[in-house]
Amino acid sequence: MAELFNFEMTATDGKARTGVIHTPRGEIRTPAFMPVGTAATVKAMMPESVRATGADILLGNTYHLMLRPTAERIDRLGGLHKFMNWDRPILTDSGGFQVMSLAGLRKLTEKGVTFKSHIDGSRHELTPERSMEIQRLLGSDIVMCFDECPALPADRDRIAESMRLSMRWAERSREAFGDRPGHALFGIQQGGLEQDFREESAEALTKIGFDGYAVGGLAVGEGQEAMFGCLDYAPDMLPVDKPRYLMGVGKPDDIVGAVSRGIDMMDCVLPSRSGRTGQAFTRHGVVNIKNARHQDDPRPLDENCSCPACSNYSRAYLHHVFRSNEMISGMLLTWHNLHYFQDIMAGMRESIAAGTFEAWQKTFHETRAQGDIEPL
């Protein structure tokens, strides 16, 4: 019998890979971009709208859901999939990053992290064991092990200490996760921008054994050049037959650069957050729909995009509803952005399978460099 969760690589082109992650809830085509459903919703989107963009999988946030409405309540109500009406796979993060970035009065120990909720100031403790329990209650298809992600820049001693703590937590996460057929546990490589620490982390994780591996600790302020420098070697240290997930990366240029370096999965709030603030991603770069140049423009955001915003509405209309603070503005621009990101992923999958990924990248970068269409 086939495994309930497995990764099938179907083609490579250079370091870039395309394939399918098989799960009981459906297939995830890779490279895959995961929209972020922070509080059991992708902001400004209905679940069926997210499905229509081409998304195979969503990301949920353990930290936010454990605080409100709580994992126990979601479990009583039938699990996260039923709660938010999403019938495809869900990956949940471990909560570690949000604890470090959002929570107040944190105390880090070998056991875990105690912190105050950013919502009401209540005290909580998050450990590898508790993180695994929360993600089990949520019913996540892909569970992330609990880790610490230090902000960059940081000195080598701090990075080493943090990475080794995360590796001990990874072992505890693996033990607490147990044997759950159909559910996957991913380990998270840490080590900052230090190649030797990345190698040490990868060796520790591989020895423990996971269903997939994430490259963590990037997109935390180091800049694209430094991130790409790390990605030139970090994914190569991870098992070739398992999915590789780059956490929290979502600018189009970053996504394409990551895939060219062997990454299979990514997530980011950028397309939805930008949509709500009047920014649309197009083949020609970012369009700020709030700008007055769009107020009399009858053309779509992108004439080659088939999303509802581009198929049915003009730039002038999108400008108007944004300036009028109408809810439909965030809905249409978020839908467009998520559709565009999924178009990028589909283009990469097709070109990798055809062996034309280098040419696809060239066209992608040249088109973006042209900038937005001239105003009327």
Swiss-Prot record:
Annotated positions binding Zn(2+): 305, 307, 310, 336
Keywords associated with the record: Glycosyltransferase, Metal-binding, Queuosine biosynthesis, Transferase, tRNA processing, Zinc
GO annotation, biological process: queuosine biosynthetic process; tRNA wobble guanine modification; tRNA-guanine transglycosylation
Subunit structure: Homodimer. Within each dimer, one monomer is responsible for RNA recognition and catalysis, while the other monomer binds to the replacement base PreQ1.
UniProt-annotated binding residues for substrate: 93-97, 147, 190, 217
Tree of life domain: Bacteria
Region (RNA binding): 248-254
Active-site residues annotated for this sequence: 93 (proton acceptor), 267 (nucleophile)
GO molecular function: metal ion binding; tRNA-guanosine(34) queuine transglycosylase activity
Cofactor: Zn(2+)
The enzyme's E.C. designation: 2.4.2.29
Species of provenance: Ruegeria sp. (strain TM1040) (Silicibacter sp.)
Keyword match Glycosyltransferase: yes
SUPFAM superfamilies on file: tRNA-guanine transglycosylase (SSF51713)
Free-text remark on how the cofactor is bound: Binds 1 zinc ion per subunit.
Catalysis performed (reactions): 7-aminomethyl-7-carbaguanine + guanosine(34) in tRNA = 7-aminomethyl-7-carbaguanosine(34) in tRNA + guanine
Gene Ontology CC terms: cytosol
Purpose: Catalyzes the base-exchange of a guanine (G) residue with the queuine precursor 7-aminomethyl-7-deazaguanine (PreQ1) at position 34 (anticodon wobble position) in tRNAs with GU(N) anticodons (tRNA-Asp, -Asn, -His and -Tyr). Catalysis occurs through a double-displacement mechanism. The nucleophile active site attacks the C1' of nucleotide 34 to detach the guanine base from the RNA, forming a covalent enzyme-RNA intermediate. The proton acceptor active site deprotonates the incoming PreQ1, allowing a nucleophilic attack on the C1' of the ribose to form the product.
Protein name: Queuine tRNA-ribosyltransferase
A Pfam family hit: TGT
